[in-house]
Amino acid sequence: MAAGPRNSMLLVFALLSLPWPQEVGAFPAMPLSSLFANAVLRAQHLHQLAADTYKDFERAYIPEGQRYSIQNAQAAFCFSETIPAPTGKDEAQQRSDMELLRFSLLLIQSWLGPVQFLSRVFTNSLVFGTSDRVYEKLKDLEEGIQALMRELEDGSPRAGPILKQTYDKFDTNLRSDDALLKNYGLLSCFKKDLHKAETYLRVMKCRRFVESSCAF
């Protein structure tokens, strides 16, 4: 299968290089509105990165004639679909902020292990030679969500449901069709889960701080 366009690969690298509002691990005491704004921005960057990476992998390795049927088969692939998390904005609006934060945290934590193997999936080092930075950005978002949970509960941690299952590692054998389909499915789930986390955070932010950006 043909290699993906260099320009699209450079786009993903550029997204990885985007500055964050705070350095990794930096969540000092700040107003609740700022905590939400920072977490939403981080989630948006990660979701965009996941979406572009999925499209790059698709163009590079998945024949166009097979994409539709494979995408339909992926509908029930993500194990995150087995937890009672809202599937969209309308459902999210029916949940409490703490519920949405817990679901967001579960989704982020489920990818902390798998993303460390992304650099072995793409031979182009410009894309995932910096996969450790993807991991750092996920850890940063995890910390931001935990900061919000502490703030909303006055610093008293509260145990939530634990997602014991995590996603498989990405397969590095790109000469195998089965491995390509597995990686394609994992990237699809990565994109879906980050979209959910972004949606939950935006719903909470808009619910607490009415603003023009609430229309999404």
UniProtKB/Swiss-Prot annotation:
CDD domains hit by this protein: somatotropin_like (cd10285)
SUPFAM superfamilies: 4-helical cytokines
PROSITE patterns assigned: SOMATOTROPIN_1, SOMATOTROPIN_2
One matching Pfam family: Hormone_1
Biological process per Gene Ontology, one example term: positive regulation of receptor signaling pathway via JAK-STAT
UniProt family annotation: Belongs to the somatotropin/prolactin family.
Protein name, entry field: Somatotropin
Name of the gene: GH1
